[in-house]
């Protein structure tokens, strides 16, 4: 599981806070933003709407450590919230969280299901039921994985993969879940197979 590459976003300090002033920024192609975090003062920013939207659509901002270049001063951050215009589907505001290198953070990491072609259950027509598409982990910023791979090799119809079956990279830990060993994915028989089995049983 490869560690993710750093994403860089350019930002500038923002003095204006009033609603009309921020709307004027948007009309000029900028996005109002803020960065905050424990032990840090809130800092108001502006971003290039074109640059940020391009990074977002490429998937580069999902669970990624970001290097914010704030008028030449570099800070590490995570995207914590994005507000969208309900009609235009454009970004209206972005919340970042400061990240201190060396400290551990909680972050949701997407799951990637690999080796479907090596699953006998899927080859026999089984259906892959994904119950969980991301999991929360705790690690230092430099250890954040791009994805966590779930290997389907050898899995038969009726088998499941649970959280305790997943191997994490060194330095990455699962965050406790209310259900200790929850199910991530199962391989079930197709409906037609189930109906056929039921018919044979009734006969």
From Swiss-Prot:
UniProt keyword list: Ribonucleoprotein, Ribosomal protein, RNA-binding, rRNA-binding
Keyword S-adenosyl-L-methionine tagged: no
One biological-process term from Gene Ontology?
A: translation
Check the record and name the SUPFAM superfamilies matching this protein.
Ribosomal protein L25-like (SSF50715)
Q: Name one GO molecular function term.
A: structural constituent of ribosome
Q: Is Ribonucleoprotein included in the keywords of this UniProt record?
A: yes
Q: Which GO terms describe its cellular component?
A: cytosolic large ribosomal subunit
Name the family: Belongs to the bacterial ribosomal protein bL25 family. CTC subfamily.
Question: What name does this protein carry?
Answer: Large ribosomal subunit protein bL25
> What does the record give as the organism's lineage?
Bacteria, Pseudomonadati, Pseudomonadota, Alphaproteobacteria, Rickettsiales
Q: Which gene encodes it?
A: rplY
């Amino acid at each position: 599981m490869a560690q993710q590459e750093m994403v860089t976003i350019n930002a500038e300090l923002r003095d204006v806070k009033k609603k009309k002033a921020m709307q004027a920024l948007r009309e000029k192609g900028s996005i109002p933003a803020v960065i905050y975090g424990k032990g840090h003062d809130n800092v108001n920013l502006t971003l290039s709407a074109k640059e940020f939207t391009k990074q977002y659509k490429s998937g580069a901002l999902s669970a990624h450590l970001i290097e914010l270049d704030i008028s030449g001063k570099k800070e590490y951050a995570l995207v914590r919230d994005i507000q969208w215009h309900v009609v235009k589907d454009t970004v209206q505001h972005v919340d970042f969280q400061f990240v201190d290198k060396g400290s551990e953070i909680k972050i949701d990491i997407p799951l990637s299901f690999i080796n479907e072609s090596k699953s006998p259950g899927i080859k026999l027509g089984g259906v892959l039921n994904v119950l969980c598409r991301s999991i929360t982990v705790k690690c230092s910023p430099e250890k954040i994985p791009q994805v966590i791979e779930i290997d389907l090799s050898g899995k038969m119809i009726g088998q499941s993969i649970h959280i305790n079956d997943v191997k994490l990279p060194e330095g990455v830990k699962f965050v406790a879940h209310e259900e200790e060993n929850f199910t991530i994915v199962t391989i079930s028989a197709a409906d037609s197979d189930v109906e056929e089995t039921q018919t044979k049983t009734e006969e």
